[in-house]
Amino acid sequence: MNPNFLDFEQPIADLQAKIEELRLVGNDNSLNIGDEISRLQDKSKTLTESIFGNLTSWQIARMARHPRRPYTLDYIENIFTEFDELHGDRHFSDDAAIVGGIARLDGQPVMVIGHQKGREVREKVRRNFGMPRPEGYRKACRLMEMAERFKMPILTFIDTPGAYPGIDAEERNQSEAIAWNLRVMARLKTPIIATVIGEGGSGGALAIGVCDQLNMLQYSTYAVISPEGCASILWKTAEKAPDAAEAMGITADRLKGLGIVDKVIAEPLGGAHRDPVAAAALIREELSSQLAMLKEFDNDELLARRYDRLMSYGL
């Protein structure tokens, strides 16, 4: 199967394969088959709109994990200028599962922090598949406190299955690192905007997700546990993951309806991986607009608004 397509996209993949075959035939024989290619392209677009207009929660969860989906560094490259990555937590080491540094958005200095997964096997291992250890969260905390000190807004990108549950992480007090970040972010006297770009997994996501404005990409997810994990607990089998995904309400639209998410950012047709540059442009537009809005509040108003936002969850 074409790695650019998931199994429920197979009809689209078949049409795209036919289009590529026709292009090759046309190149080899100098035949004018442009009309047929255009017809198939229109058919592919219509089919894509039909499939993506009716995705289940489980299908959206799989889209959030798509191996071609843009990651934090992809968005940094396409949204910001003059990015200067900063390293280390000043306690133990540098965690490559969290990237962060100073950049400019519309000429304004900002602190950008996000989870980073990895493409190839070696990079996946180096970045621990996007699952931070305590030093990753402590690095993020250090950068956020730096941002407050220099009056820079904080922009975070969330994309993790969850915090790393290994013994070494627990020995270095993973839960304390996450809890400390929640405490610090709730009190930071600078605007914070968080955007879920893929998986928003449990406390590992929330540790850089306390904010004044929460965005989710159209095909991202945000939940306290993975659908497979939930299914394993409730039904004793991960095969019930589709049912768990539906019951948990993990999608952007469901969470927007609950008042947890402020803005659902549309993705290009077929998902952000089909057109990463266009996806980045949509995020950039929203970030610029939200930063301008948050600048209208002084520090006391910002903190009061953030507190009210957090206390409204579950009401």
Swiss-Prot record:
Primary residence: cytoplasm
Location(s) in or outside the cell: Cytoplasm
Record's function text: Component of the acetyl coenzyme A carboxylase (ACC) complex. First, biotin carboxylase catalyzes the carboxylation of biotin on its carrier protein (BCCP) and then the CO(2) group is transferred by the carboxyltransferase to acetyl-CoA to form malonyl-CoA.
Alphabetical UniProt keywords: ATP-binding, Cytoplasm, Fatty acid biosynthesis, Fatty acid metabolism, Lipid biosynthesis, Lipid metabolism, Nucleotide-binding, Transferase
Family, as annotated: Belongs to the AccA family.
Taxonomy, superkingdom: Bacteria
The reaction(s) this protein catalyses: N(6)-carboxybiotinyl-L-lysyl-[protein] + acetyl-CoA = N(6)-biotinyl-L-lysyl-[protein] + malonyl-CoA
One Gene Ontology term of the molecular function aspect: carboxyl- or carbamoyltransferase activity
InterPro entries: Acetyl_CoA_COase_a_su (IPR001095), ClpP/crotonase-like_dom_sf (IPR029045), COA_CT_C (IPR011763)
Official protein name in the record: Acetyl-coenzyme A carboxylase carboxyl transferase subunit alpha
Residues of the CoA carboxyltransferase C-terminal domain: 40-293
Subunit structure: Acetyl-CoA carboxylase is a heterohexamer composed of biotin carboxyl carrier protein (AccB), biotin carboxylase (AccC) and two subunits each of ACCase subunit alpha (AccA) and ACCase subunit beta (AccD).
GO biological process: fatty acid biosynthetic process; malonyl-CoA biosynthetic process
GO CC terms, sorted: acetyl-CoA carboxylase complex
Recorded metabolic or biological pathway in which this protein acts: Lipid metabolism; malonyl-CoA biosynthesis; malonyl-CoA from acetyl-CoA: step 1/1
EC numbers for this chain: 2.1.3.15
PANTHER family according to UniProt: ACETYL-COENZYME A CARBOXYLASE CARBOXYL TRANSFERASE SUBUNIT ALPHA, ACETYL-COENZYME A CARBOXYLASE CARBOXYL TRANSFERASE SUBUNIT ALPHA, CHLOROPLASTIC
